[in-house]
Amino acid sequence: MVLNDDDLYKKHDQLVNLKRQTYEKIFNRCVNTIKLSSDAGELICLFQIPNFLFGTGYPIVNIKYCANYIINKLSEMNENIETTFIDPNILFIDWRKKPNKQPKTTHHFSTNSSEYKSRKSKH
């Protein structure tokens, strides 16, 4: 009996691939939920990560790994999207516009009392 690397890693590689495919399907469902919410005029939504997914070869989903997968992909897609994981399996997704930070104006006085300077600085 020979133990070559291909035989040893074949099943593991198949399971890793099935897991990625399963997480991708769940991610696509999440994106659809965001689009539907956005089309309805909403700026936030909730997405429930399923405990299992029918029709895949990898039915058991590790919720926290799946949540990380979705959060990372959403942040890669759009940096304005903020996602919070809520135990046990909920994602709170927020794409409201964040207020722009205006540079604070600081006032500087020269030694000449009649001269007044105003500068914008970022803090």
From Swiss-Prot:
InterPro entries: DUF5759
Region (Disordered), start-end ranges: 100-123
Cross-referenced Pfam families: DUF5759
Taxonomic superkingdom: Viruses
Protein name: Uncharacterized protein R447
Species name: Acanthamoeba polyphaga mimivirus
